């Protein structure tokens, strides 16, 4: 969902918080795997249903999620869920449920947006493709359209689904209010933290893109002698670059010991492969360099949850043998490559302070990610850090971090 959020809001910001589960009237869960992969979230939803009377509407692929307790379960093929949401958006527009005032004040709508939506997502076409009757689908849409506080839970990997969900919430004004927001679930506990510090190939650190201004600011902040000038490679593109010789060295940081097939192929093909991993892999003995790192329960640092909550992760067990933190390993590799001055870190708190200061650097309010309050944090204070959420209630005044202050509806395929 990172690309969709950046395109719609102007910044990769999650509008929701877990407290919105209790504040909502209706939770629309898209995909049964969300309940299975996020048991704490599932327990929270169950408590909200029992204590607050929150309704749960589950959109699940045929045969999936049959054991999930929901007020209503709708079977829709996985590859048609984005179309189902787009049909809901068109129905809201055609029946006058979209928030015209909110759209006029706070959202830019492409000239042909509604025309394109009308030709591709009419009630009958969506019903036929999803295996539902038009009468049944209209009743479902009517039921959802009149609920003012809706939280939509969805997986962030499907960009088409993310665009449809975000468009629905923007067009109906169900955003920037307690209990009303799109909520993309991250696959990893620190998924948002990784995006904030620039681990996605599509952006720079601290929610900066590859604009000339952003690159100049980061170059000054880091006193960088060389800076990336455009998005990097990801997934299959990275494997292709290894095969054709554009990439000669690869550093892999693995936390669960399970590398995807494309990464294993890349590590086998690259001349220099370095793996920071807590797991021994007999199949890879003698192939590349393996550096022992901390497993999840041995890690020590901060992480950012899906709802912008920064919390302190403390090591449960001492590091065994020669194992070191991943950040320390990256620092040593960088120093060995000749970048000693840029990688001077000796403590995890130093990295946190630098990240905090970078979010505030040249930030006059154009970006919501601003951790300025922690810029002077000391090492002892870092050790005692308690959870805190940045961004308060994003977009509550209808303003977005775009040049004109307006969000954007995203064209749907």
Features from the language model and the residues they span:
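Segments forming glycine/polar-rich beta-alpha architectures that bind adenosine-containing cofactors
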Residues: 399-413
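Cofactor-pocket helix-loop regions in the catalytic cores of large enzyme subunits
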Residues: 1-396, 405
């Amino acid at each position: 969902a990172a690309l969709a959020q950046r395109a719609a809001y102007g910044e990769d910001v999650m509008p929701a918080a877990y407290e919105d589960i209790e504040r909502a009237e209706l939770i629309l869960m898209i995909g049964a795997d969300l309940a299975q992969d996020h048991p704490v979230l599932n327990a929270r939803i169950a408590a909200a249903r029992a204590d607050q009377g929150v309704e749960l509407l589950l959109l699940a692929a045929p045969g999936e999620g049959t054991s999930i307790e929901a007020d209503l379960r709708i079977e829709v093929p996985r590859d048609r869920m984005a179309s189902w949401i787009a049909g809901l958006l068109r129905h809201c527009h055609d029946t006058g449920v979209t928030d015209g005032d909110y759209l006029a004040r706070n959202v830019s709508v492409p000239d042909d947006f509604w025309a394109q939506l009308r030709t591709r997502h009419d009630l009958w076409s969506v019903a036929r493709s999803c295996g539902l009757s038009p009468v049944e689908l209209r009743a479902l849409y009517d039921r959802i359209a009149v609920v003012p506080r809706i939280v939509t839970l969805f997986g962030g990997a499907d960009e088409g689904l993310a665009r449809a969900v975000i468009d629905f919430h923007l067009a109906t004004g169900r955003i920037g209010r307690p209990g009303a927001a799109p909520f993309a679930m991250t696959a990893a506990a620190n998924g948002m933290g990784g995006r904030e510090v620039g681990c996605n190939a599509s952006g720079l650190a601290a929610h900066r893109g590859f604009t000339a201004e952003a690159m100049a600011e980061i170059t000054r902040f880091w006193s960088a002698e060389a800076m990336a000038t455009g998005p990097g490679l990801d997934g299959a593109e990275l494997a292709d670059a290894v095969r054709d010789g554009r990439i000669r060295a690869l550093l892999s940081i693995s936390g669960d010991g399970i590398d995807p097939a494309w990464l294993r192929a890349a590590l086998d093909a690259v001349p220099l492969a370095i793996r920071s991993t807590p797991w021994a892999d007999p199949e890879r003995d003698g192939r590349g360099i393996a550096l022992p790192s901390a497993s999840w329960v041995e890690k020590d640092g901060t992480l950012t949850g899906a709802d912008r909550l920064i919390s302190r992760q403390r090591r449960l067990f001492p590091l065994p043998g020669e194992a070191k933190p991943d950040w320390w390993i990256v620092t040593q590799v960088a120093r060995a490559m000749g970048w000693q001055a840029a990688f001077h870190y000796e403590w995890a708190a130093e990295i946190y302070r630098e990240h905090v200061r970078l979010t505030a650097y040249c930030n006059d309010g154009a970006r919501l990610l601003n951790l300025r309050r922690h810029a002077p944090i000391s090492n002892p204070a870092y050790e005692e850090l308690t959870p805190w959420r940045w961004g308060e209630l994003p977009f509550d005044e209808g303003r977005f971090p775009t040049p004109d202050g307006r969000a954007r509806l995203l064209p749907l395929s």
